[in-house]
């Protein structure tokens, strides 16, 4: 039998990225924070639901803050320093997620609202009667 050459386990080298983008999608039910490089390749992400919040607590500003802290801490392995923030959606976690990214230690260079606004497209959901 032929001897198979053993492969030595290679350590995966993380690419170093100085500038990145943070995409915050704040819906009424959840907040999703994705940190990408300049080309849009995801480096890390976190959600309010994945951070341990369930039900109505998912849609709180504190849950968005925890999600942003988790995504920011995971992206620090790539050497990120500056973030450009894109916020989408009307949810309660918009501002607290930005503040949390700032508190993690990133320098926020730009904040852009990219909430999609229809040009009289689909009919919106009916108003809630509580």
Curated annotation (Swiss-Prot):
Pfam families in UniProt: Ribosomal_S11 (PF00411)
GO molecular function per UniProt: rRNA binding; structural constituent of ribosome
UniProt record, GO biological process: translation
Keyword list, A-Z: Ribonucleoprotein, Ribosomal protein, RNA-binding, rRNA-binding
Alphabetized PROSITE patterns for the sequence: RIBOSOMAL_S11
Family matches, as InterPro entries: Ribosomal_uS11, Ribosomal_uS11_bac-type, Ribosomal_uS11_CS, Ribosomal_uS11_sf
Claim: DNA repair is one of the keywords in the record: no
Cellular component terms per the entry's GO annotation: ribonucleoprotein complex; ribosome
SUPFAM superfamilies: Translational machinery components
Family assignment from sequence similarity: Belongs to the universal ribosomal protein uS11 family.
Subunit description: Part of the 30S ribosomal subunit. Interacts with proteins S7 and S18. Binds to IF-3.
Function summary: Located on the platform of the 30S subunit, it bridges several disparate RNA helices of the 16S rRNA. Forms part of the Shine-Dalgarno cleft in the 70S ribosome.
Entry protein name: Small ribosomal subunit protein uS11
Organism of derivation: Shewanella baltica (strain OS155 / ATCC BAA-1091)
Gene behind the chain: rpsK
């Amino acid at each position: 039998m032929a001897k198979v050459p053993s492969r030595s386990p290679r350590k995966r080298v993380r690419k170093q990225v100085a500038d990145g983008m943070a995409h915050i999608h704040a819906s009424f039910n959840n907040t999703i924070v994705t940190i990408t490089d300049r080309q849009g390749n995801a480096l890390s992400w976190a959600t309010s639901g994945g951070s341990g919040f369930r039900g109505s607590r998912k849609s709180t500003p504190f849950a968005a803050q925890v999600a942003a802290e988790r995504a920011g801490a995971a992206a620090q392995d790539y050497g990120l320093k500056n973030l450009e923030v894109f916020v989408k959606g009307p949810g309660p976690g918009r501002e607290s997620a930005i503040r949390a990214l700032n508190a993690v230690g990133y320098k926020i260079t730009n904040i852009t609202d990219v909430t999609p606004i229809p040009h009289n497209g689909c009919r919106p959901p009916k108003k809630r009667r509580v």
